[in-house]
Amino acid sequence: MKDYNIENNNVEEENPNVETQVVDNEEIVRLKAEIEELKDKLIRTTAEIDNTRKRLEKARDEAKDYAIATFAKELLNVSDNLARALAHKPANSDVEVTNIISGVQMTKDELDKIFHKHHIEEIKPAIGSMFDYNLHNAISHIEHPDHEPNSIITLMQSGYKIRDRLLRPAAVQVVKKP
């Protein structure tokens, strides 16, 4: 009988091992699924972080490019006034007036260089070109037999843009249909 008990003891001991192996296999499958889920979350989180970084870099670059926009808008009137002064210079003038005009011209040229350096472009549509509501502001409409409808007949004030952003539209007079 002792032998029989020993065999039973062995059998009883083997059963927990089988259950442990089954439980271990189920646990392995569950853990593998959890690992896959965590890998997926890691990939998604990494992609989200990368996208956030790219958005922040783009926002930083735009902020750098357009930070001077408000200041530039205020300088546009200065540029306009310098251009008006140069447009009305007298034909014949003495040395002092010529020197003043030369100084105004140098100031205007320097301001234009600064505008160019900061990607500020003048919008100066040609007479006869078509009106573009993205770049122009129609101050008035007149009939004119020699020009197409919706074409620009008079430039009243230059416009400006910084890169692709409009600072001020060009003020124009537009031909209307007769």
Curated annotation (Swiss-Prot):
Q: Which GO terms describe its molecular function?
A: adenyl-nucleotide exchange factor activity; protein homodimerization activity; protein-folding chaperone binding; unfolded protein binding
* Presence of keyword Cytoplasm: yes
- One Pfam family, short name please? GrpE
Q: Could you give a single Gene Ontology term from the biological process aspect?
A: protein import into mitochondrial matrix
Q: Which UniProt keywords apply?
A: Chaperone, Cytoplasm, Stress response
Signal as a keyword of this entry, yes or no, is no
Localisation: Cytoplasm
List GO terms (cellular component aspect): cytoplasm
Q: Which family does this protein fall into?
A: Belongs to the GrpE family.
What job does this protein perform? Participates actively in the response to hyperosmotic and heat shock by preventing the aggregation of stress-denatured proteins, in association with DnaK and GrpE. It is the nucleotide exchange factor for DnaK and may function as a thermosensor. Unfolded proteins bind initially to DnaJ; upon interaction with the DnaJ-bound protein, DnaK hydrolyzes its bound ATP, resulting in the formation of a stable complex. GrpE releases ADP from DnaK; ATP binding to DnaK triggers the release of the substrate protein, thus completing the reaction cycle.
Record text on subunit structure and interactions: Homodimer.
Q: Which PANTHER family match?
A: GRPE PROTEIN (PTHR21237), GRPE PROTEIN HOMOLOG, MITOCHONDRIAL (PTHR21237:SF23)
Checking HAMAP family in the record gives: GrpE (MF_01151)
Name listed for the protein in its UniProt record: Protein GrpE
Q: Which gene name belongs to this protein?
A: grpE
